[in-house]
Amino acid sequence: MRQYPGMTRPLATVHTTETDIVTGFLRALERCDIDAALAMVTEDLVYQNVSLPTIRGRRGLDRAFRPMLRPGRMGFAVCVHHVACDGDVVLTDRTDEISVGRFRARFWVYGRFVVRDGQIAVWRDSFDWFDITVGMVRGLAGVLVPVANRQMPS
């Protein structure tokens, strides 16, 4: 990364507690470690997938995720392309993957997290329905012809 006058180190290497909390949360979801993920959110969490119903509270997140996100049922993977932090707000540009058996749907997600007192208080994801539809079609095709399903970015 190019250095500019006044920069003490490249921006790509800047880590904050807030970004570590958010990426740690996403990694816990990848491991299907719901208990670890729940420990990283506030009791009054607001989780919104834009255009879908809002989930409120740690218990609401637990009720939504625990039944489905577990090994042998449904998996989740994430590739964070970019992360930015401004105070208590963390932005992520990422590719998410939802998998069930051989089915794998990958799609772009923009996330906005607000960290309060070391825990995630707001988790708001935005996505493109067309991109999700393409990911689902590729995922279905990939069940029959594995090469039709694109690889997770690295």
Predicted regions and their residues:
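Charged/polar, solvent-exposed surface patches and flexible loops
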Residues: 24-27, 39, 63, 67, ...
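Short, low-complexity N-terminal intrinsically disordered segments enriched in polar/charged residues
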Residues: 1-39, 43, 150-154
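Alpha-helix initiation/capping motif
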Residues: 11-15, 54, 102
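Hydrophobic alpha-helical core bundles mediating ligand binding, dimerization, or RNAP-core interactions
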Residues: 22, 29, 41, 61, ...
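A structural signal for well-ordered alpha-helical scaffolds and beta->alpha junctions
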Residues: 18-22, 58-61, 106
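Short glycine-/acidic-enriched loop or helix-start segments at secondary-structure transitions
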Residues: 15, 57, 132
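A beta-strand edge to alpha-helix "cap/lid" segment located at domain peripheries
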Residues: 2-10, 69-154
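A solvent-exposed, acidic/Ser-Thr-rich amphipathic alpha-helical stretch
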Residues: 34-38, 42-88
